[in-house]
Amino acid sequence: VVTIVCLDLGYTLKCNKLVPLFYKTCPAGKNLCYKMYMVATPKVPVKRGCIDVCPKSSLLVKYVCCNTDRCN
């Protein structure tokens, strides 16, 4: 008798891509979702995805990071 056991050893985070209808599963080590947009147009995201460290925002670009599935 052969028994195969599959264990999920880690939580996998899912982050939205630029179009929120689509998402991707983040690779190991990238445990944040982010959304980047221009300060002048805050309702129009420029980029979304997975990241390891949330970048600092600037006068022109704002980053919003979170750590739950599809929160970006």
UniProtKB/Swiss-Prot annotation:
Similarity comment: family membership: Belongs to the three-finger toxin family. Short-chain subfamily. Type IA cytotoxin sub-subfamily.
PROSITE patterns with a match to the protein in the record: SNAKE_TOXIN
Keyword Cell division: no
Disulfide-bonded cysteines: C15-C33, C26-C50, C54-C65, C66-C71
Native organism: Naja naja
Domain of life: Eukaryota
MF terms in GO: toxin activity
Protein name, as recorded: Cytotoxin 9
Compartment(s) where it occurs, according to its Swiss-Prot or TrEMBL record: Secreted
Main localization category: secreted
Role of this protein: Shows cytolytic activity on many different cells by forming a pore in lipid membranes. In vivo, increases heart rate or kills the animal by cardiac arrest. In addition, it binds to heparin with high affinity, interacts with Kv channel-interacting protein 1 (KCNIP1) in a calcium-independent manner, and binds to integrin alpha-V/beta-3 (ITGAV/ITGB3) with moderate affinity. Preferentially binds acidic phospholipids like phosphatidylserine, phosphatidic acid and phosphatidyl glycerol.
Binding partners and assembly: Monomer in solution; Homodimer and oligomer in the presence of negatively charged lipids forming a pore with a size ranging between 20 and 30 Angstroms.
Keyword line: Cardiotoxin, Cytolysis, Disulfide bond, Secreted, Signal, Toxin
Single biological process term from Gene Ontology: killing of cells of another organism
Listed Pfam families: Toxin_cobra-type (PF21947)
Signal peptide as annotated in the record: 1-12
Keyword Disulfide bond attributed: yes
Tissue specificity as recorded in UniProt: Expressed by the venom gland.
A Gene Ontology cellular-component term: extracellular region
InterPro entries: Cytotoxin_Cobra, Snake_3FTx, Snake_toxin-like_sf, Snake_toxin_con_site, Toxin_cobra-type
